[in-house]
C-alpha cells in the first residue's frame, strides 16, 4: 500500500514513492512556488530572539549609544 500525501502548495494528492520526482510537491511549479515563499520570507521558522532590549538597561546603555561615532568597546589592538 502506497502512502498518499497532500501537496503543501495546492493540496493535490501525491503518491509518496521513489518515482515521485517532486515529492512532497505534485509538480515542479508547486515546488518553485514554495521555494519563492521561503526566499521572500513569507515562510519562516519561528525562533526566540536572542536580543533582549531590557538587557541594555541592565548594562547601563540605551539604543542610541550603539549609533555613536566612537565605539565604547574599541581597544588599541583593533585599530
From Swiss-Prot:
Belongs to the DNA gyrase inhibitor YacG family. InterPro entries: DNA_gyrase_inhibitor_YacG, Znf_NHR/GATA. Its cofactor is Zn(2+). GO terms for biological process: regulation of DNA-templated transcription. Inhibits all the catalytic activities of DNA gyrase by preventing its interaction with DNA. Acts by binding directly to the C-terminal domain of GyrB, which probably disrupts DNA binding by the gyrase. This is DNA gyrase inhibitor YacG. The lineage of its organism: Bacteria, Pseudomonadati, Pseudomonadota, Gammaproteobacteria, Alteromonadales. One of its GO terms (molecular function) is DNA topoisomerase type II (double strand cut, ATP-hydrolyzing) inhibitor activity. The gene is yacG. Disulfide bonds: none annotated. Binds 1 zinc ion. Zn(2+) binds at residues 7, 10, 26, 30. Interacts with GyrB.
Amino acid at each position: 500500500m502506497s502512502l498518499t500525501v497532500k501537496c503543501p502548495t495546492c493540496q493535490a494528492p501525491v503518491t509518496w514513492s521513489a518515482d515521485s520526482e517532486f515529492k512532497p510537491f505534485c509538480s515542479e511549479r508547486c515546488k518553485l512556488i514554495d521555494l519563492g515563499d521561503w526566499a521572500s520570507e513569507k515562510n519562516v521558522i519561528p525562533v526566540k530572539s536572542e536580543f533582549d532590549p531590557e538587557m541594555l538597561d541592565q548594562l547601563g546603555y540605551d539604543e542610541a549609544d550603539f549609533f555613536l561615532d566612537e565605539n565604547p568597546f574599541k581597544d588599541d589592538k583593533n585599530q
